[in-house]
C-alpha cells in the first residue's frame, strides 16, 4: 500500500501509564519510525512512518493502549511520507 506518515493525538488517561514506552515497543515491533511524546494538555502525540498496513495496526493498538490506560479518543491525521526518521523514539 505504500509508505505513509500518520499523526495521532491520543486522549484519555494516557499519561503516567507507560503509554509512551508501550507505543515505542509496538511501533518497533511493526517496523515503524517516528516518535511519541506527552503533551501539556494530558494527551499523547504520536508521529509514525512506515507501511500503511502497519500504521493502521498502530492506530488500532493506540485505541486500546497498555492495560493501565483508558483511551477515550484517538484523532488521526494522515500525511505524506517524509523519510526523516531512522528509529522510533520517546521525546520530552
From Swiss-Prot:
Pfam families named in the record: Acylphosphatase
Keywords: Hydrolase
GO molecular function, one term: acylphosphatase activity
Catalytic activity: an acyl phosphate + H2O = a carboxylate + phosphate + H(+)
Leader sequence residues: none
Acylphosphatase-like domain location: 5-92
InterPro entries, sorted: Acylphosphatase, Acylphosphatase-like_dom, Acylphosphatase-like_dom_sf, Acylphosphatase_CS
Catalytic residues identified in the record: 20, 38
UniProt-listed Enzyme Commission number(s): 3.6.1.7
Enzyme class label: hydrolase
Family recorded in the similarity comment: Belongs to the acylphosphatase family.
Database matches in PANTHER family: ACYLPHOSPHATASE (PTHR47268:SF4)
Protein name, per record: Acylphosphatase
Organism: Sorangium cellulosum (strain So ce56)
Amino acid at each position: 500500500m505504500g509508505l505513509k506518515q500518520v499523526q495521532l493525538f491520543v486522549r484519555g488517561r494516557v499519561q503516567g501509564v507507560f503509554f509512551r514506552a508501550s507505543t515505542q515497543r509496538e511501533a518497533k515491533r511493526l517496523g515503524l519510525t517516528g516518535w511519541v511524546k506527552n503533551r501539556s494538555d494530558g494527551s499523547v502525540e504520536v508521529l509514525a512512518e512506515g507501511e500503511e498496513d502497519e500504521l493502521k495496526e498502530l492506530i488500532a493498538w493506540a485505541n486500546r493502549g497498555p492495560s493501565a490506560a483508558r483511551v477515550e479518543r484517538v484523532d488521526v491525521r494522515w500525511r505524506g511520507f517524509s523519510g526523516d526518521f531512522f528509529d522510533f523514539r520517546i521525546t520530552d
